[in-house]
Design a protein with these regions (language model features):
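Intrinsically disordered, low-complexity N-terminal segments that are enriched in acidic
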Residues: 1-45
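Low-complexity, flexible helical/coil segments
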Residues: 15, 69-77, 178-179, 235-236
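Extracellular structured ligand-interaction cores
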Residues: 30-36, 195-197, 207
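Active-site neighborhood of thiol-dependent amide/isopeptide-bond enzymes
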Residues: 93, 97-102, 106-196, 203, ...
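A recognition module on extended beta-rich or small alphabeta surfaces enriched in W/G with H and D/E
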Residues: 189-190, 197-237
Length: 237
């Protein structure tokens, strides 16, 4: 619905992200466009369900062409210089990709904090964050650090941008607002629900979700320390 001339959703971009394009008459006094979507969600809980409990990487790891894209550096996701230095220090001599990812995630949980003064979700400039030593930010900043360190450690990783769809029922016992919220009828106002999380790829398994930033967000909202049992429970989840 609306007074647009044309509107469509396309995935014709480098990362296949669904993007809405719309045009209006240049003289339109008001630009209206209403979109209705039916969303289906599912839980992805590989750690909770023990799906990776006995994970062992293949002897010879070969990534497909599309996965190899997520090993490459970008403008904000550098994989050399200070990023590589941090990655090497964090993972040490570990060779198992899952354990390397866990070391990186735990390092971020232990060392990074959420800064609510950051505009939007942050810009995710990892090199700047590590160079300045100001280990703070919002979701794009914190989860981009995970992605950069993972790539620098030889693990394909990517940011996933989207919108929280309401309350996270399973995480509500740790925080009523940090992971999304809804009213008494279960209806959520998603206009402020923009979020960036991350995923890393394990050969022989697939993409694994990780959200170091939400641990920092919960800590700030609930005034929890890194060592608090709730912090560690959310980090493990």
């Amino acid at each position: 619905e609306g007074n647009y001339l044309d509107a469509y959703v396309t995935e014709n971009n480098k990362y296949g992200a669904k993007t809405l394009f719309a045009t209006w008459d240049k003289d339109a006094q008001k630009r209206d466009l209403k979109i209705t979507m039916v969303i289906e969600t599912k839980d992805r809980e590989p750690m909770v369900k023990g799906a990776l409990e006995n994970y062992k990487p293949p002897k010879d790891i070969h990534y497909s062409v599309d996965v190899q894209e997520y090993l490459k550096p970008t403008q904000h996701i550098k994989t050399d210089g200070i990023v590589k230095q941090f990655a090497d220090k964090i993972v040490g001599t570990e060779t198992n990709p899952l354990k390397k990812a866990e070391l990186i995630h735990q390092w971020i949980v232990n060392n990074m904090e959420r800064d609510n003064s950051v505009l939007g979700c942050g810009d995710g400039d990892v090199e700047k964050i590590l160079t300045t030593g100001v280990l703070k930010g919002k979701c794009t900043d914190i989860n981009s650090v995970f992605v950069a360190l993972a790539r620098a450690s030889g693990i394909p990783a990517r940011e996933i941008f989207g919108i929280r769809l309401g309350a996270a029922d399973k995480m509500g016992k740790y925080s009523k607002g940090a992971f999304g919220s809804a009213d008494e009828h279960g209806v959520a106002n998603v206009s402020g629900g923009q979020h960036c999380r991350a995923e890393f790829y394990l050969a022989g398994f697939g993409w694994v979700p990780v959200d170091s930033a939400d641990v920092a967000k919960m800590r700030l909202a609930e005034k929890k320390s890194v060592d608090d049992k709730d912090t560690q429970a959310v980090a493990k989840y």
